[in-house]
UniProtKB/Swiss-Prot annotation:
Presence of the UniProt keyword tRNA processing in the record: no
Gene Ontology molecular function, alphabetical: 3-phosphoshikimate 1-carboxyvinyltransferase activity
Family as reported in the entry's similarity comment: Belongs to the EPSP synthase family.
Binding residues annotated for 3-phosphoshikimate, in chain numbering: K22, S23, R27, S170, S171, Q172, S198, D314, N337, K341
Name the record gives this protein: 3-phosphoshikimate 1-carboxyvinyltransferase
Species in which this protein is naturally found: Sulfurovum sp. (strain NBC37-1)
HAMAP family for this protein: EPSP_synth
Length: 427
């Protein structure tokens, strides 16, 4: 097994240019592929997840050119849904941002498709999306377990109409349906069942659809109306914002052991909800400064928080490890959807925090964390989850070193993460 041991970091200071956002990169690639015209996408994230989307688009006949460093992609739009004569199997790894949106998009055209992925992908639910697509006229079959990939899609277009979708597990299901809805034959009304999680991710989807020429009427995140029979219109250039979830590690590091860290590529006008992570650090006691395209954080005396983190589930993971450096007991509430991510993150986080000496209570949808007087050295298991590896790297900010098992899992969103962290660290 591969592992790296991070030696104790004395001080953090510097500037980080963020890689492109995973959420925006894969949405932009798919919409550009469905659009009429050619779109140049800049600051694209180079990662496993985008690679899976690009491979799928190539198999679907989409033409694109990639720059040498794979951060710029010129996509020749298909001018509407995909039509294929031969049955196609698409392997999507563990990329939820490829699996869910493609599942919806492929129902719009014609052809037979099998969507599959890594073993963990087969444990990640997709039933709420499939139920909604079936209501809109899609023919989708589960090939192994009911409610989970792999799936077989026999595409013949979506009729539209009134569709209900459960919003309580993952916002990606609604994102997938929204992105496909304009190309249904008729108008679509989407009614949300249950409380919609991760609303800021829906804002990302609506923002990108609007840039490609499609308006959605949003009634308080309870009901959405989309006109059918539309085609997305290509953009000359679409610039992908920096990844706000990835920013969280560097900002937290500054709050714990700064100095000041400035991250560029996101700022006060960012469309990503995860920029609110900086507000949480400020609440804990760090000093935060905002610009249009940067956020900077400086060290402060950190105190525990008790908060609902439903709006920023990915960045909230970073708060769980930051809590080890705060005074008091931190409570993260309303984070059930951690359980259906790359791994069961609630359970994984509780297990690994206990290894370093924290007192942890793991509830169905919450976590309480009381830091120990002194952290213990531990070998942290990452569960093939990029965010586990990056969150626990913050433990190097303690005088005790930390070992991260299988650190290469950061390739999912941030292949150069450990090099970038080192570049702003003094030992």
């Amino acid at each position: 097994m591969n592992s790296i041991t991070l030696k104790p970091i004395r001080y953090i200071e510097g500037e980080v240019n963020l890689p492109g956002s995973k959420s925006l990169s894969n949405r932009a690639l798919l919409i550009a592929a469905l659009a009429e015209g050619t779109t140049r996408i800049t600051n694209l994230l180079e990662s496993d997840d985008t690679r899976h989307m690009l491979n799928a688009l190539k198999l679907l006949g989409v033409e694109y050119t990639l720059s040498e460093d794979r951060t710029e992609c010129t996509v020749v739009g298909n001018g509407g849904p995909f039509h294929t004569k031969e049955p196609l199997e698409l392997f999507l790894g563990n990329a939820g941002t490829a699996m869910r949106p493609l599942c919806a998009a492929l129902t719009l055209g014609s052809g037979t498709y099998v969507l599959t992925g890594e073993p963990r992908m087969k444990e990640r639910p997709i039933g709420h999306l499939v139920d909604a697509l079936r209501e809109a006229g899609a023919k989708i079959t589960y090939l192994e377990n009911e409610g989970y990939p792999p799936l077989k899609i026999e595409a013949d277009g979506l009729k539209g109409g009134e569709v209900r979708i459960d919003g309580s597990i993952s916002s990606q299901f609604l994102t997938a349906l929204l992105m496909a809805a304009p190309m249904a034959r008729g108008d679509m009304q989407i009614d949300i069942v249950g409380e919609l999680v991760s609303k800021p991710y829906i804002d990302i989807t609506l923002h990108i659809m609007k840039q490609f020429g499609v308006e959605v009427r949003n009634e308080n995140y309870e009901r959405f109306f989309i006109k059918g029979g539309q085609i997305y219109q290509a953009l000359e250039t679409f610039m992908v914002e920096g990844d706000a979830s990835s920013a969280s590690y560097f900002l937290a590091a500054a709050a714990i052991k700064g100095g000041t860290v400035k991250v560029t590529g996101i700022g006060k006008t960012s469309v990503q909800g995860d920029v609110a992570f900086a507000d949480v650090l400020e609440k804990m006691g760090a000093k935060v400064e905002w610009g249009d395209d940067y956020v900077s954080v400086s060290r402060g005396e950190l105190n525990a928080v008790n908060m609902d983190f439903n709006h920023i589930p990915d960045a909230a993971m970073t708060i769980a490890t930051t809590a080890l450096f705060a005074k008091g007991t931190t409570t993260l509430r309303n984070i059930y959807n951690w359980r259906v991510k790359e791994t069961d993150r609630l359970h994984a986080m509780a297990m690994e925090l206990r290894k370093v000496g924290a007192k942890v209570e793991e509830g169905e949808d919450y976590l309480t964390i009381t830091p120990p007087v002194q952290l213990k050295h531990a070998a942290i298991d990452t569960y093939d989850d990029h965010r586990m590896a990056m969150c626990f790297s913050l433990l190097a900010l303690d005088p005790v070193s930390v070992t991260i098992n299988e650190p290469e899992c950061t390739a999912k969103t941030f292949p150069t993460y450990f090099e970038v962290l080192e570049s702003i660290s003094s030992y």
